[in-house]
Amino acid sequence: MTRIEEEVLAGVPVFPLPQVVLFPEVFLPLHIFEPRYRAMLTDCLDGDGALVIAQVDRESGRIADVAAVGVIVDHRPLPDGRSNIVVAGSARVRLDELVTEDLPRYPYKRARATRLDELDVSVADGDRAALVAAATMFVAEVKKHDPTFELQMPTQPTASALADICAFHLVVDSAVRQLILEELDPRIRVRMVMDQLAVQHGAMLREAKGTVLN
């Protein structure tokens, strides 16, 4: 994925979305329709294409401090001014503060952000294999209900990337996804994803058993 330069993070556009958590190494399709975000999209396309996708609480309006910065890699404009885009996740960031300068020029939120690098530690081969097994079993269970479901993986992803991809595509609870995003130790992150997939798999099995009994 494209590495975003530090100066870009000095005033990066922020797209707050409820229940959406972007991760590095994943692709997020979005539909842009609000006027302020159309303006944001225009500015992004005129610049380096970078923006932060941050989870926002529907009730309080609070934007998560930790988010992911990505780059627009596909843009499909529609005749009425709306657009479909795809954002490629690049890195974890911490939103240090919202930028308030020149507000009339920018109808959308911008922030000063700092890149968050994960710890330089190795994930045990056994843990990586266990995550692959947990994801494989969960996907197989999902496919019983939705035969069209597919989980696309890059060739030989690192354990860290594997955890992020599985969290993005397979973890249902956005609050749990946020916690996984915030964890900078890939060893812990791998276990968090495994544990959550086990919980979800068990819930699906219990639901299926209950359906049969009824």
Ranges and model annotations:
Residues 1-214:
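N-terminal low-complexity, acidic/polar interaction/targeting segments
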